[in-house]
UniProtKB/Swiss-Prot annotation:
Chief localisation class: nucleus
Listed name of the protein: GATA transcription factor 10
Molecular functions per Gene Ontology: DNA-binding transcription factor activity; sequence-specific DNA binding; zinc ion binding
Organism lineage string: Eukaryota, Viridiplantae, Streptophyta, Embryophyta, Tracheophyta
Known role: Transcriptional activator that specifically binds 5'-GATA-3' or 5'-GAT-3' motifs within gene promoters. May be involved in the regulation of some light-responsive genes.
Pfam families, A to Z: GATA
Gene name for this UniProt entry: GATA10
Organism of this sequence: Arabidopsis thaliana (Mouse-ear cress)
Location of this chain's protein in the cell: Nucleus
Recorded family membership: Belongs to the type IV zinc-finger family. Class A subfamily.
Amino acid sequence: MNWLPEAEAEEHLKGILSGDFFDGLTNHLDCPLEDIDSTNGEGDWVARFQDLEPPPLDMFPALPSDLTSCPKGAARVRIPNNMIPALKQSCSSEALSGINSTPHQSSAPPDIKVSYLFQSLTPVSVLENSYGSLSTQNSGSQRLAFPVKGMRSKRRRPTTVRLSYLFPFEPRKSTPGESVTEGYYSSEQHAKKKRKIHLITHTESSTLESSKSDGIVRICTHCETITTPQWRQGPSGPKTLCNACGVRFKSGRLVPEYRPASSPTFIPSVHSNSHRKIIEMRKKDDEFDTSMIRSDIQKVKQGRKKMV
């Protein structure tokens, strides 16, 4: 899209070529031409340009395609020739102001500034930076996620009890679903039962041996039992009652209806080993005549005495 018509553009070009434009430019710049030596200056400039070396290619990276490429539908802007010197002057003034302000703002070396200005961020560098930041975060999180364990205590483990040492001659019989503790407690209960049976048999044998050694077979005068762990004093004298009857006699509760459950003369309808039940039975005897039952009991006692 043209800013000026073609006729006006041609007139401007003619004015520039005629030299009027450059005369006005020199008047505005006010640069005396007498100070410039035309003969020596040209030779020095040529020698200096010959000594210059071309810059390395790595210093200037390739420009992005967005700046170099131009869309097809977009129209190119044409700048008139009379505005080019004014643009050059404004650019040079901005550059000079930037140079004057940079030393106060930053004190970095020029090489670092140049490399920083021409440094371009590629996708690979962006990925590397992001990967580095993620790795530092992951390393920090891993340090926090795995704390250091403390020292282990030197506590001794509980010793397991071996049943083979306790009962070496008894084979252990356990069901598939039985645990170790259940088997241990069951074996202990079995051993206690055996001990009780052994103690009872031992007391019975000791009483029989003592009666045999005395030459007299002892019988309780109240319940007519033969076996007892201890003979006690009764109304007939010392060692005439069994242990249960002797305890009752000592407390004053020995009645005819009392019999221990192990007595051979124990009849459930007549006798009992509980004092409360005996009182209830006596109340019933007052209501019903129990003389016949008592006579039968006396006959049984007499028959037993004859047999002994």
